[in-house]
A protein has these predicted regions:
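Short aromatic-acidic-glycine turn motif
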Residues: 333-342, 351-353
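Short, hydrophobic/aromatic beta-strand segments
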Residues: 322-328, 338-342, 400
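Extracellular adhesion/glycan-binding regions together with long Ser/Thr-
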Residues: 350-390
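Beta-strand-rich interaction surfaces with strong enrichment in secreted/lumenal proteins
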Residues: 300-301, 315-316, 372-377
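Acidic, serine/threonine- and proline-rich intrinsically disordered appendage/tail regions
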Residues: 392-472, 483-484
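Short, hydrophobic/aromatic-enriched beta-strand segments in well-ordered soluble domains
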Residues: 277-281, 299-302, 328, 383-393
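Extended, low-complexity intrinsically disordered regions enriched in serine/proline/glycine/threonine
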Residues: 1-292
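Short beta-strand elements of extracellular/lumenal beta-sandwich folds
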Residues: 303-332
Length: 484
């Protein structure tokens, strides 16, 4: 992950990418979140990811209140980003774009949080390849010539079980009154490798085995270049030895949220030669139970034939005593004509009612259906949200080129406020005080299509999850709220 900032009132592009800075400046963008992902994150197997992203392309942005035409700025933004990252974002138009009312709240400071300034779209069919990776790496201060970015070889990355590239841009206040603010750009890549299959049943791994090479140099422009290895389970579910020895060991947190981290200062280690961080396990792979997430959602299409069908969202609240208030956002393509009167919300034999319903019907070839529900999920129970639809007749030119894929449907987005942080996720470094200066708010996202939890120093977090059905429902998600 790389993070660098640009003062809002100063055109300083020594580290901040000039091309991206010009795009957000010309289009009056206050906040931007973009991800390009290949594969699906298996949350029940891998826990919660550090940076959530659904398959395909996923984009949402907040615009300044003085923007003359948000719709025009959004179109110009998607076209510019399409050229910037060699992606098909130019296919983002009114038929896949919505302005959510209660979802996707700004993560940073914005002058106005009016939902009319927000635009959200997803292209679950978008494929990711080296044409996207190369321009993404060029946005880094040292490109792929030095530092951690030298590990990003396309051959190794695209053979991973999961690969995601992300750009997150937001405005950060430097004082309480926000007189001084900066633009913060966070670039992250998320990868999942199956080391057990690659190493004949052993979990043993190293940088050279995963990425094809070690690290020879650090980026001279970076103020800090560090590798963190979570060793919390070392000795409990399997014993392994790290080599070389870490620069520092940190233990923080309490109870179920206690974490142990091995910290490697890249600048220190590369001065002594090439760094090939490795973990050598004593025994073959050991399987253990993964705790259930506090909220879990699955989503699928039901019915048969080519005329009618339905979409079912099954939301599981695993809290044994507390009900949870959530916001469910669902964007349905215009070619699926939704019958709102068929909407059913149930938990076991009980029929539930939504606290708030916001629905904008779609128009053929003009806009999608936009449904937002505020729900109270009973404790230790599964809540089912289902509705029916009718497929529209399409022109022969409107069918996708590959009939084997069929039509993709963007995933639902589930938002909730949790009282406590969750133990079962991959991205927990908020418990380590020495890391808070590096990342003050930690993201850990989870879901059948994606779930987000934001953890501040206090035990509060925003939990967001999206789910989807491959071949019937594509996978996309995302919303963040800032914790005080």
């Amino acid at each position: 992950m790389h993070r660098f900032t640009l003062p809002c009132a100063v055109q300083h592009f020594r580290l901040f990418p000039l091309s991206l800075g010009e795009i957000v400046s010309q289009q009056r963008v206050q906040e931007l979140h973009l991800s390009l992902t290949q594969g699906r994150w298996q949350h029940l197997k891998w826990g919660y990811p550090f940076q959530e992203a659904p398959p395909g392309a996923h984009l949402w942005a907040w615009f300044a209140p003085d923007t003359l035409s948000v719709s025009s700025a959004w179109k110009n933004l998607t076209n510019a980003l399409s050229g910037q990252l060699c992606a098909s974002l130019n296919f983002v138009d009114d038929t896949v774009t919505v302005s959510p009312k209660r979802s996707f709240q700004p993560q940073g400071w914005v002058r106005s949080a009016n939902s009319s300034l927000l635009r959200y779209a997803a292209l679950p069919r978008e494929s990711v390849c080296t044409e996207n990776l190369t321009p993404w790496k060029k946005l880094l201060p040292c490109s792929s010539k030095a530092g951690l970015a030298t590990l990003l070889h396309a051959l190794q990355l695209f053979t991973a079980n999961y690969m995601s590239l992300a750009l997150d841009l937001k405005t950060v206040c430097q004082d309480e009154d926000c007189v001084h603010a900066t633009l913060e750009l966070q670039m992250s890549v998320s990868l999942v490798f199956d080391t057990v299959a690659a190493q004949n049943g052993y979990q043993t791994w190293s940088l050279s085995k995963l990425f094809g090479a070690g690290i020879k140099t650090s980026c001279p422009l970076s103020s800090m270049s560090t590798i963190y290895v979570d060793i919390s389970n070392n000795g409990s579910v399997g014993t392994y030895r790290l080599s070389p020895e870490p620069t520092q060991l940190v233990v923080s947190g309490e109870g179920a949220h206690k974490r142990s981290l091995a910290i490697y200062d890249l600048k220190h280690h590369v001065a002594q030669g090439r760094l090939n961080l490795a973990a050598q396990y004593e025994k073959p792979h050991i399987f253990w139970l993964i705790p259930e997430p506090p909220l879990h959602i699955t989503r699928y299409i039901q019915g048969y034939g080519l005329e009618r069908g339905g979409i079912v969202n099954r939301i599981q609240n695993n809290n044994p005593t507390k009900a949870v208030r959530v916001v469910l956002l669902d964007i349905i393509p215009w070619f699926l004509r939704v019958y709102l009167h068929t909407l059913k919300i149930s938990s076991g034999p009980r029929q539930l009612k939504a606290e708030h319903v916001s629905y904008q019907p779609g128009r053929d070839r003009e806009r999608p259906h936009h449904l937002e529900l505020t729900l109270i999920l009973p404790p230790a129970a599964e809540t089912i949200v289902a509705y029916e639809f009718e497929r529209a007749f399409l022109k022969w030119t409107e069918y996708p080129p590959d009939a084997n894929h069929g039509f993709y449907i963007g995933s639902a987005v589930l938002s909730a406020l949790l009282d406590e942080p969750v133990a079962n996720y991959s991205g927990d470094i908020s418990v380590c005080p020495s890391l808070r200066h590096w990342l003050t708010i930690v993201e850990a996202k989870k879901g059948s299509g994606g779930l987000l939890q934001r953890l501040a120093s206090k035990a509060k977090g925003l939990f967001r999850k999206s789910s989807s059905e491959s071949s019937g429902c594509g996978d996309s998600s995302d919303q963040d709220k800032k914790n005080k």
